[in-house]
């Protein structure tokens, strides 16, 4: 039997469980989380003796994020809005992490920036009707426009319902 460990960490943008809907606050929470992982790595013994400040998440989560912060494991962020994609690229550059982007409904709008950052994207079939405000600019040609700009594009399934699966014909 061949078995491989985890290959990536996945995070969503704008998740209701994040406790915020403000984008600036959301990114502040990501920065605090990554700063906490770095602090935890440097002061693990102090953490275990209760001599550190309270961190943003549990010890198990801090441990799980160490390979991401160290650049050994990619972080897959699910983002749609062009401004959020650019913010994710800035975040990855600031923290020196390997980043993959998923969904990227408005990726075609910032395809040059994604290509310049050498960040691969995972896209699926979509139609011209947005599902939320973050994907108002989505286009059926998103994957083709990203590829034409030099972005590495991975085609993924976008859902299990009949309607979502039916949109496979819309990949261009």
Q: In which residue ranges do the predicted regions lie?
A:
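Active-site environment of divalent metal-dependent phosphoester hydrolases
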Residues: 82-86, 106-111, 161-163
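Catalytic beta/alpha-barrel core
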Residues: 74-80, 98-107, 126, 130-131
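Histidine-anchored nucleotide/phosphate-binding helix
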Residues: 89-92, 105-108, 143
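Surface-exposed patches in mature extracellular/periplasmic domains of secreted proteins
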Residues: 46, 100-104, 155-158
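His/Asp/Glu-enriched, well-ordered alpha-helical/loop segment
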Residues: 74, 112-172
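Polyanionic/metal-chelating signatures
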Residues: 1-99
């Amino acid at each position: 039997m061949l078995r491989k460990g985890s290959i990536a960490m996945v995070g969503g943008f704008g998740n209701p469980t994040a406790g915020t809907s403000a984008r600036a606050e959301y990114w502040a929470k990501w920065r605090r989380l990554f700063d906490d992982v770095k602090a935890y790595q440097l002061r693990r013994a102090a953490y275990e003796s209760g001599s550190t400040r309270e961190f943003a998440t549990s010890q198990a989560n801090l441990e799980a994020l160490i390979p991401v912060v160290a650049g050994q494991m990619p972080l897959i962020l699910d983002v749609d809005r062009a401004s959020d994609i650019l913010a994710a690229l800035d975040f990855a550059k600031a923290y020196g992490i390997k980043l993959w982007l998923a969904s990227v409904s408005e990726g075609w709008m910032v395809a040059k920036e994604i290509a310049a950052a050498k960040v691969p994207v995972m896209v699926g079939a979509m139609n011209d009707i947005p599902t939320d405000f973050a994907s108002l600019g989505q286009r059926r040609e998103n994957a083709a426009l990203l590829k034409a700009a030099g972005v590495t594009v991975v085609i993924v399934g976008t859902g299990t319902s009949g309607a979502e699966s039916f949109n496979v014909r819309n990949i261009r």
